[in-house]
Amino acid sequence: MSKILVFGHQNPDSDAIGSSVAFAYLAKEAWGLDTEAVALGTPNEETAYVLDYFGVQAPRVVESAKAEGVETVILTDHNEFQQSISDIKDVTVYGVVDHHRVANFETANPLYMRLEPVGSASSIVYRMFKENGVSVPKELAGLLLSGLISDTLLLKSPTTHASDIPVAKELAEIAGVNLEEYGLEMLKAGTNLSSKTAAELIDIDAKTFELNGEAVRVAQVNTVDINDILARQEEIEVAIQEAIVTEGYSDFVLMITDIVNSNSEILALGSNMAKVEAAFEFTLENNHAFLAGAVSRKKQVVPQLTESYNA
């Protein structure tokens, strides 16, 4: 078989990078596939910290599979086409490893799919290593652990599955790190946003969802102090309005997540704010509102928005 590109979603986070790099290695070792892990964007601060810590080179960034002369791809940490490579509809999807909802996804041919409602795609990839009798190199264990820590906020998010806890402990042992100490330092590395422009900030970890025919952009930034982000509200709103006009979003929802106290502030702009308010049963004041206990876009924001937009 010819070369296969393996990649996570656009605006890649630690799980997208870690799961794709590790799965590309597994596919070579277990099944002899000619795989290369690539990325659909540059690593964010958190992921850059992870790659540097474990001495792993960042995957090269690609925009088109066809431009690489590649006809076949494997997706990790996503399946929705609008979150994937630009020419996803023009290539063959060989396989998917994901832990999200399945939506806006269709293929012409059968494929391999591994979908589990767990805390991270990295958790699934690690189990696949074990199932296939392939040892996980120390640096890849570090990347997989980081993906799990990132997506579950160090196992505190409601997306954390019971099986993620032993996975985290095993990966920490292989990687040679203290789970709690490393995890906290890693998460803190991702909260240093002072050098980011407002446009960069709202695009660090952002995904587009099609909700009842509306293109809704849901972004998330992690911080140790929500007020640090709200202090930049004016410039952030300008950037959001520009994104809405340029990209054609109907609405833009920004989660500002306090990783210390496990709460979020929702900053939202667009044409369906009544639906956003109904989703979370709050009232936006000056375009934002507090959402107690919310840390997960996947479990505590997108499903609620989906229900409200479909009502």
Swiss-Prot record:
Record-stated family: Belongs to the PPase class C family.
Cofactor dependency: Mn(2+)
GO molecular function, one term: manganese ion binding
Reactions mediated catalytically: diphosphate + H2O = 2 phosphate + H(+)
Binding site for Mn(2+) 2: 15, 77, 99, 151
Keywords: Cytoplasm, Hydrolase, Manganese, Metal-binding
Coiled coil: none
Taxonomic lineage of the native organism: Bacteria, Bacillati, Bacillota, Bacilli, Lactobacillales
UniProt subcellular location: Cytoplasm
Keyword tRNA processing tagged: no
Protein name as annotated: Probable manganese-dependent inorganic pyrophosphatase
Key word Transport present: no
Binding site for Mn(2+) 1: 9, 13, 77
Organism: Streptococcus agalactiae serotype III (strain NEM316)
Record note on cofactor: Binds 2 manganese ions per subunit.
EC number: 3.6.1.1
